[in-house]
Amino acid sequence: MSDILVPLIFTDAAAKKVKFLIEGEENPELRLRVYITGGGCSGFQYGFTFDDKLNEGDLTIENLDVALVIDPMSLQYLIGATIDYVEGLDGSRFVVQNPNASSTCGCGASFSI
């Protein structure tokens, strides 16, 4: 990562997993997009998808030669967050550690502010 201040952290573990998944898709233009939608048991939920397009206003954060992309609407809910990838007994997944969330559901997939 560069010395430029970014509003959230894209961990090495997450970047390594993204890089592995992109290599499997054989499309080097893919980026991991994280976004917020309404729903879930706590009001908002996180979403992850691969995207090969950038939209106007998207923020791109690079780590280990891969990119994380966030749209402006979602970014306001993610400032200060950490995007990570964890593996454990309950499976493996991308996770968001969000200091803006006042509460989260039991599985961590949705949150409220």
Swiss-Prot record:
Iron-sulfur cluster binds at residues 41, 105, 107. SUPFAM superfamilies: HesB-like domain (SSF89360). Pfam families: Fe-S_biosyn. Coiled coil: none annotated. Its cofactor is iron-sulfur cluster. The keyword ATP-binding does not apply. Homodimer. PANTHER family: IRON-SULFUR CLUSTER ASSEMBLY 2 HOMOLOG, MITOCHONDRIAL. This is Iron-sulfur cluster insertion protein ErpA. It comes from Glaesserella parasuis serovar 5 (strain SH0165) (Haemophilus parasuis). The gene is erpA.
